[in-house]
């Protein structure tokens, strides 16, 4: 096995710039910034979106109803739903 071909894997603090949420994780991401977190100094990586601010994880997701081809055809030609007439 060759030596010195793998990047340095170490603990890094990620900072969500949207909410200010910080979390510690292992990463190979390099950073010149450092931060004090839980009494230790770690490299700091700033991210725009994390699980603290992403709409999927926060529940603020907007769902859109995708109409099917039949529904679009019926809307286009003004046809009523056959099941609704019964």
Swiss-Prot record:
- Subunit-structure text: Part of the 50S ribosomal subunit.
The record's annotation in PANTHER family points to:
50S RIBOSOMAL PROTEIN L31, CHLOROPLASTIC, LARGE RIBOSOMAL SUBUNIT PROTEIN BL31C
GO molecular function term, any single one: structural constituent of ribosome
At the top level, the lineage of the source is Bacteria
Its name, as the record gives it, is Large ribosomal subunit protein bL31B
Organism source for this protein? Streptococcus equi subsp. zooepidemicus (strain H70)
Give the record's GO biological process terms.
Answer: translation
**Keywords on this record?**
Ribonucleoprotein, Ribosomal protein
Presence of the UniProt keyword Cell cycle in the record: no
- Write out the GO cellular component annotations: ribonucleoprotein complex; ribosome
Q: Which family does it belong to?
A: Belongs to the bacterial ribosomal protein bL31 family. Type B subfamily.
InterPro entries per the record? Ribosomal_bL28/bL31-like_sf (IPR034704), Ribosomal_bL31 (IPR002150), Ribosomal_bL31_B (IPR027493), Ribosomal_bL31_sf (IPR042105)
């Amino acid at each position: 096995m060759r030596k010195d071909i793998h990047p340095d894997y170490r603990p890094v603090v990620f900072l969500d710039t949207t909410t200010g949420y910080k979390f510690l994780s292992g990463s190979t991401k390099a950073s010149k910034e450092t931060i004090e977190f839980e009494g230790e100094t770690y490299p700091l990586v700033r991210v725009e979106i994390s699980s603290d601010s992403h709409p999927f994880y926060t529940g603020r997701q907007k769902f859109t109803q995708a109409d099917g081809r039949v529904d679009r055809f019926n809307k286009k030609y003004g046809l009523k739903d056959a099941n609704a007439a019964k």
